[in-house]
Amino acid sequence: MPSSTFSGTVSTPKLSVAVDMGNPFLNLTVDAFLKIGAVGVTKSLAEDTYKAIDKGSLSKSTLEHALKKLCKEGVYWGAAGGVYIGTEYGIERIRGSRDWKNAMLAGAATGAVLSAVGKKGKDTIVIDAILGGALATASQFVNNHYFY
């Protein structure tokens, strides 16, 4: 049975976390869940901090609501990141190449899955799939400097 390890290092201004689940697919998916989930938590924390400062008061119920929202946002964003990275890795393994087409297909699949889980209509699912594919493709182009 494969062993799992978790290690991390901190060096200014970079935080590095390595996850070894014994399988590349699981490694990438869990790593994406943790990193993108942290982005979701940070986003929610910034929003709630702004609201508390704008409102000018802080109560126990406000803190409880903020904590609950932090957890939900972290899981939602982490799940989205995990689905996207896992799907992109699977497509890469099937196609045997690593290019923008993988990002487009994975983005479309992730957009459709997240929309379907959100119990939206089928028109919205298609639109979210198109949006997910477009955003993932644009991100891939920017990251790989296809525009230069």
Curated annotation (Swiss-Prot):
Disruption phenotype: Strong red Pchlide fluorescence after 3.5-4 days of growth in the dark, and cell death after subsequent illumination. Conditional seedling lethal phenotype related to defects in import and assembly of NADPH:protochlorophyllide (Pchlide) oxidoreductase A; excess Pchlide accumulated in the dark operates as photosensitizer and provokes cell death during greening. The keyword Ion transport applies. Keywords: Chloroplast, Ion transport, Membrane, Plastid, Plastid outer membrane, Porin, Transmembrane, Transmembrane beta strand, Transmembrane helix, Transport. Induction: Transient reduction upon de-etiolation (illuminated 5-day-old etiolated seedlings) (at protein level). Strongly induced by low-temperature stress and weakly in response to osmotic stress, salicylic acid (SA) and exogenous abscisic acid (ABA) treatments. GO terms for cellular component: chloroplast; chloroplast envelope; chloroplast outer membrane; etioplast membrane; peroxisome; plant-type vacuole; plastid; plastid outer membrane. It is a multi-pass membrane protein. Residues 2-73 are annotated as: Contains 4 beta strands. InterPro entries: Tim23-like (IPR045238). The chain crosses the membrane at residues 75-91, 102-118, 125-142. The keyword Plastid applies. GO terms for biological process: monoatomic ion transport; protein import into chloroplast stroma; response to cold; response to glucose; response to jasmonic acid; response to sucrose; response to wounding. Expressed predominantly in leaves and cotyledons. It holds the Pfam family Tim17. Stimulated by GTP. It is found in: Plastid, Chloroplast outer membrane; Plastid, Etioplast membrane. It comes from the Eukaryota. Belongs to the Tim17/Tim22/Tim23 family. Plastid outer envelope porin OEP16 (TC 1.B.30) subfamily. Homodimer and oligomers in membrane. Forms large complexes including TOC33, pPORA and OEP161 during pPORA import into plastids at the plastid envelope membrane. Voltage-dependent high-conductance channel with a slight cation-selectivity; selective for amino acids but excludes triosephosphates or uncharged sugars. Non-essential amino acid-selective channel protein and translocation pore for NADPH:protochlorophyllide oxidoreductase A (PORA) and possibly PORB. Involved in PORA precursor (pPORA) import and thus confers photoprotection onto etiolated seedlings during greening. This is Outer envelope pore protein 16-1, chloroplastic.
